[in-house]
Amino acid sequence: MPQPPPNAYKAGTRLTVGSHKVSIIKYISEGGFAHVYTCTIDPPFQGSTVACLKRVVVPSKWQLSLLRQEVDAMRRLRGNKHIVSYIDSHASRLGDSNTSGTNHSQQQQYEVFLLMEYCENNGLIDFMNTRLVNKLTEKEIIDIMYQVTIGVAMCHHLRPPLIHRDIKIENVLIDGKGVFKLCDFGSSVNYLPPPRNPQELQLMKDDLMQHTTPQYRAPEMIDLSKGFPIDDKSDIWALGIFLYKLCYYTTPFERPNQSSLQELEHTILNCSETLRFSDQPGSIFSPRLKNAIKVCLRADPRRRPNAVQLLGEIAAMKGEKTIPNVVPYSVIEQQRTKQASALEEDTKKGQASFVETKKITSKPKTDPFANIDKSKFLNKSGYKLSSVTAESRTVPARPLSAFFDDGNTPRIYSQGNRSTPSVQDYVKEELAKGESYEFNEPDGTLEFLKSREEEKLNQRNDTGGSFKAAFKNGLRKISTGGNISANNTGSSVKSNRRASLKRIITGGSNHNRKHSEENTKNVEDSNPVSSAPKKLSIQHRMQQLLNQNDHQRVQKSAQGYGKYTDIKASEDIDEINKPTLSKHSQKKLSPPAVPVNLSSQRNKSQQSSSTTKKYPIKDSKPLSKVRNNPPKDSVKTKPPPPKPKKPVYLKSPTKLEIADQRRLSDASEISMPDLDDLEKQFSKRFPSYV
């Protein structure tokens, strides 16, 4: 038993550590600034009144923070079987008169008491010293390694993980029941990333030299320039050294002829070549156990196993079928607390949302659409409404707005037409019958739609169309979702088909220009509110530019193109402050002009175009984006170069000749060529192929 130092506590000294009253029994050992004692505590811990007291005199605040890390680590690992249990702690300032040692510092010193579980059977190193002749058997080694690996795995499963950094034989204790426990967390840290600059590299090197044991250091701790972090794989390396020493009572890289630390570090860095197993009689172990040592002592930390993988291999060697739980007790309690709090919050939110939903989603007492009887107009067309108590049918996996029931099977709306098929079919039947109905039901849906359509027809100045035609147009607009641009003028079905064909080909209207001008005037008279200037189409403006003479030619400029760049800052502010929503002026509707080659008056226009070379503009206003300034005298416009004459054999017949050849009858405005006409044209254009 070592002799106590002069400043050590004597037996019977009474102290208070946290909430425990302590009485010193005897002095055990010392290390660094720490003294270790056995003591009695009140109240007892886990039925035992004997505990271990660690007294540390800290010379600076920086070392005080390191000691606090040890206390916090033991507190987080409290309640685990293979780690020395934390009981209580206390810290206080220390005066110069109470300092330990011979050196008195002018800095403020601190005194820290750490109360821990007492292990009666001392440490593992003491147990191995009793077995110097009869060394540990492989079964005993596997059992010790199994328990220590569980303690290391628990450190690595904390949140955040805890790196011990000083795993060795001397830091394993044995309690009264023969359980091996990991202790001394004074060197433990969290994950340490690789250094980023020379200053960080030097600080990390000094820290490792102070808080680690040279024989147990990993290669990444010696050569920091490799850029590997200090993480759990460094503890795995130390476990490999620990296992080797259990087997051979020495570390694998110690040599009798080593005289310096640099030689030891050089041997560790070349571990792939210097690792050897000194098998002797009485210390011959299985290849599986040697392989476990080899994988832990790999130079590349990325190729080493983690604590759980190593524990699984040791458990398999021990004969265990399952791996024990290595999640620390504190983490389990933290998860339970979070789950309980989350469940409580969800319950409160659920109750609050239930109350709000109950207030918001309260159903109205009356249905606003209950008074609409759709059977009145559906029965007229032969349709029967399906009963409300019909059998439930399978609905396709689509949104409710994407399908409908036709009475038999669910069907999907087509993307091109959004109307319901029942309305479409009804419209088709009504159009096929060609009969008009009188709806006297004031609450019917079609009566409401008909009244809305009549209002629109009155605004568009109906010119003689029948009620039947207006009703058809209204139903067509409902079923297709489109808009009918032209008013019905009472023409026959044949003329309507011809007009629709012309409108498809030309993209215009089925009225001539005169009639369109009259309709435009009617629209202007019926809509006196719109006062916006008439907007000319692109074709109309191009025609005006072509028809203008030299006197009316407008000077070309770039005005209007810089409207976003030539403005001042005040204009920018006004533009930004300008409200985005504005009332849209009502546009004046006018059908586009019919092309000359499809118009009934194209012969007259061609004759007039052949006699006149210039096209004067009739009372046309200049364009809004072009300046109305006379051209300068200095600018002389050059006439375009003469166009070369086309050879006779490449000339194609004119549009007039083609129209005359393709016309089949005088009554039809649009006619298609037959096969004989096409053959004649082909023989004329390509005589060599006939």
Swiss-Prot record:
PROSITE patterns: PROTEIN_KINASE_DOM (PS50011), PROTEIN_KINASE_ST (PS00108). Residues 515-524, 657-666 have a biased composition (Basic and acidic residues). Disruption phenotype: Leads to increased caspofungin sensitivity. The active site is at D166. It catalyses: L-seryl-[protein] + ATP = O-phospho-L-seryl-[protein] + ADP + H(+); L-threonyl-[protein] + ATP = O-phospho-L-threonyl-[protein] + ADP + H(+). Residues 599-614 have a biased composition (Low complexity). SMART domains: S_TKc. GO terms for biological process: actin cortical patch assembly; actin filament organization; filamentous growth of a unicellular organism. InterPro entries: Kinase-like_dom_sf, Prot_kinase_dom, Ser/Thr_kinase_AS. Residues 478-537, 579-690 are annotated as: Disordered. Transmembrane segments: none annotated. It is found in: Cytoplasm, Cytoskeleton, Actin patch. Residues 22-317 form the Protein kinase domain. ATP binds at I28, S29, E30, G31, G32, F33, A34, H35, V36, K54. Keywords: ATP-binding, Cytoplasm, Cytoskeleton, Kinase, Nucleotide-binding, Phosphoprotein, Serine/threonine-protein kinase, Transferase. The keyword ATP-binding applies. Residues 480-494 have a biased composition (Polar residues). GO terms for cellular component: actin cortical patch; cytoplasm. Its EC number is 2.7.11.1. One of its GO terms (molecular function) is ATP binding. Protein kinase involved in regulation of actin cytoskeleton organization and endocytosis. Phosphorylates the endocytic protein SLA1. The CDC28-CLN3 complex phosphorylation of SLA1 enhances its further phosphorylation by PRK1, weakening SLA1 association with PAN1, an activator of the actin-nucleating ARP2/3 complex. Plays a role in cell wall regulation and required for oxidative stress survival. Belongs to the protein kinase superfamily. Ser/Thr protein kinase family. This is Actin-regulating kinase PRK1. It comes from Candida albicans (strain SC5314 / ATCC MYA-2876) (Yeast).
